[in-house]
Structures are given as C-alpha cells and as structure tokens.
C-alpha cells in the first residue's frame, strides 16, 4: 500500500511522504541534477562566446568588425548590470507566494545569460549567412533581426521553463513562479546582449575618429537599451510565461496545449514588430511607437497586479475551507491571505534572528502550499495522493506554530530592547527601641 501511495504522489508531482535522510533527499532532488548539468554548460557557453566575439572579423568587401577587448567588456558590464539588478529584483518580488529557491532563480537567469545567448548567436549568425550578409554594415542584418531572431530568441529563453516544468511538475512550480522565472531568463539574456552592444559601441567609438565623443555615444546607447527599451525582452518572454501559467491551471488538455503556443506566437509577433520598427525607422519617428509599447507594458503590469489580487482571494477561500474543518485558526485566514501582513512577519523574523526567520518563512510556505494543494484538488489538476499530502501539511504547520511568528497584530518589526530594571536597595529592619 505504501508503494502504491508513493507512486501516486510521484505521478502527481508531490513530494514523497518519507523523504528519508538528507543524502537521499539530495539525490532525489531534481535541482541537483539540473545544476550539475547546466553549470558546466553555462561555463562553456560564456567561454565560447568570448572566443567568438574577441577577435576582429574581416568581411569579403574589406570592412572590419572590431572584436571586444577586456577593457570594453568590463566597462560594458558595469553599465549593463544596473538594469539587470532592477528587473531581477522586480521578478524575484513577483515570485512571492510559492517562492523558488535562490538556486532556481540563478539557473533561470544563467540560462538566459549563457545558454540562450549562445544558441541565438549561432542560429542568427547562420541565418545571416544564408541571407547573404556580406558586409560589416549594420543595415545588412535587418532581415535576420526581423524574421529569424524573434523565433530563435523567444524559443531559447522559454526553454528553461519547459525544462523546470518537466523535472518539477506540480511540486514547486506555481503560476507566478513561471512568470518570474521567464522574466529572469529574459533579464539574463538582455544583460549579456547589452554587454555585447555596449562593448561594440565602446570599441567602435574609441577606434573611429568620425564617431565623435566616445563617452556621449556610449551614454546614448546605454539610455536607449538600458532605460528606454529595457522592458522589451522581459515583456515578450512574459507573454510566453503567461501562456504557460494559464496551461498550469487548466483542466482542459486543449487549453494546456494551445495556451503556451498562443503565448509564444504573441511573444514572437511583438518581438518581430519591435525589431522591425527599430530597424526601419529613425529614433525621431519612434516616439509614438514607444508610447504604445509603454501602454502595453502598463497593461501587462496591471494584469499581473489583478492576478495577484485574485490569487490572494483564492488563498483566502482555500484557507477558509480548512478553517471550517477545524484544521486552522481564525487568524490564519486573515494573516496569511494578506501580502502586507506576510511581509511584516518576514521583516520581523529577520530582525529576530535567522532561526526565527527560517521558521516563520517555512510556516508561511507550508500554509501557502496547503492552500495551493486544496485549489488543485478542487480544479482537478492534481492526481491521487493530494489528500494525504494535505494531512501532512496540517501536521507540519501545527508542529511549527509555537516557534514561528504567526500574528502581526501588536508585533513590532524591530524588537523592543528590554531595559534592565534597577536593583532594589536592600532594606534593613530597624531594631526596636528598648
């Protein structure tokens, strides 16, 4: 019976009932094997890209494309890292309800920065040769940038999402996690791509007198790619991620197939339109299109905010189900369905030491997983074994409750210092008068 139950849990993407010792949990963890495969692959990608981009390239017409030197790469990385930090923080913040491990965030970012750029460089270069790009003129690569690069780049950036879904299944990947991980992959891709563009601009302006002021030229491209159009890659990859997120919560097999495909088609179409307008129009004529793109970014942001609000309502309803059954306390429904109360508990736990913070974070993760598992049972998107998993989560929550922060009412983020009370003066009895 135990083997049948474990088999059902594995097929449903649920963790095993008896995880065993730490070494067995480590060997069973998909993230271990994914990391052991991807990290060497990332290192190879970066080294190979460096070897490809460093030497000068001479074209058949005699023109030369200067290679990237170490000084240019260091300066370009300095300018590119700030945009990557801002967008990475935003997507990590989005992954708040069932947050992934930091290693998963790093792998998603590394896939976009290393693997996706390596794949795109090879396929886009091959496509450019097939389309007879025979000069160093940037206008010669317009057709590959419009008709080839969007398909290649969007597919390569989203590949990490499919890999994680295949290995993790329903165990850890939630709908907002898919969007966050896809965004991190896009941020990594844009980070390395910006390094290449900034580095080429630095090398070109330093070796070409006609380019004018090198610093002004570099600042111009940094503002263009790092500020004004920095939303492009994350926005397109979010479309594919949203399609996958819809597929995760759907019971229909038809929706599970068509939703990711529709998201990918929208991402490719938007990418093609963006590259086409950027390649065929001057910067003065792109102001109206830029405002339209900002409107689309605002629409996607508003959609995510509404989705977060709807997600909190779902968590609240599922926690109410457990409260009616007597498995949770009344305040659990109010506290853990509010993002702001959860943030306060996190901050208060951090200020009270690593042990308190760890127990509080684990408590919130367990109670959120309990609500998600209940929602999957109601929607029919999880197989047998989920009921047994809910009982395990309830027992783990009750065991952890005495050591975790569970009530923000009256709780100060920074604990008050206990002032030592003055030691009372000793009082000696007065001897009676004779």
What positions do the PLM features span?
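Hydrophobic alpha-helical segments at protein termini of multi-pass membrane proteins
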Residues: 1-434
